[in-house]
Amino acid sequence: MDRSTSNGFRCIKSFANDTSSAQLKGTISALFRDYRKEKPVDNKTFALYLNQYLYDKKPLESKIERTIDKDLWKIEKVTFDAGYNNERMQAWIYLPKDAKPPFQPIIFFTGSNDIYSKEFDPKRIGSLDFILKSGRAFIFPIYKGTNERHDELNSDLQEETVLYKDHVIMWGKEFSRTVDYLETRSDMQADKIGYLGWSWGGFMGGIIPAIEKRIKAIVLNVGGMEMNRTFPEVDQLNYLPRVTQPILMLNGKHDMFFPVETSQKPMYDLLGTPSNFKKKIVYDAGHLVPRTDFVKETLVWFDQYLGPVK
């Protein structure tokens, strides 16, 4: 125990009729899942789970709501049918000016900060501008529960609630509807779609590509498995073996959110991608890999599996 002069200690005085002390002496159960022992569901059961993400292929009724002209790229805010409850969603489309269409679209799944944000700032993609500089389009969907679509969702952590389950299903549909929209644009190579996930998006990279097979290459920046339990219908454990696309995992050795042995390694091992099409790099870092390496490895991966930009 650290008893330095700057540290104190806390005392408690209990009352005669106080029963809380017994609870304070009770055992605290640690939040932990041993993924070496847990097994994913069989294919027949998973096919039933996959049916949750079906939606009617109604007209997208897409509309460009706003255009922002920057020196090196153009930004479009588009809205279209979300695939459920007659709801509309939005996506920000970033188009490089120094490259010729059609563009390879890289669809981003953001980190948890966007759950707590009330409004998306289209100028904030600074650390991801290398995607545009490589000649690719960068697609930022606004998922249910984030930014302007903020609702009662208050965490990215999976949990055993209908609220969480419903959101995962909505995110899956929204991603697919975003792909549907990209397929309508002549300036997009919709057969060369990349998935880029960051933190929460790295975790969701173990789910979304199992649902949406039009994704052709995946890069996960600090992703892993969570210790929280959730309903099996949306448990990442059951989706990972069905992620079969080429996938690159970039992780930190000191990541406190996704520890190497209990989170990162089980995710990598459970992936259904053949061993020669998946790769994991661990850096001497925490929940953020060095930017230079992130940029280099991401572009090399997309060049290899989507093809170099011409």
What are the roles of these predicted feature ranges?
Residues 1-30:
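Disulfide-stabilized, aromatic/cysteine-rich ligand-recognition loop
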Residues 55-100:
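N-terminal cap/lid segment of alpha/beta-hydrolase-fold proteins
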Residues 90-91, 101-113:
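Short beta-strand element of the alpha/beta-hydrolase
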Residues 109-181, 230:
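Cap/lid segment of the alpha/beta-hydrolase catalytic domain
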Residues 173-242:
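Primarily recognizes the serine-hydrolase "nucleophile elbow" in alpha/beta-hydrolase
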Residues 243, 249-251, 255:
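Short beta-strand/loop motif that positions the catalytic acidic residue
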Residues 256-263, 290:
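Conserved alpha/beta-hydrolase "acid-adjacent" motif
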Residues 268-289:
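Catalytic histidine neighborhood in serine/cysteine hydrolases
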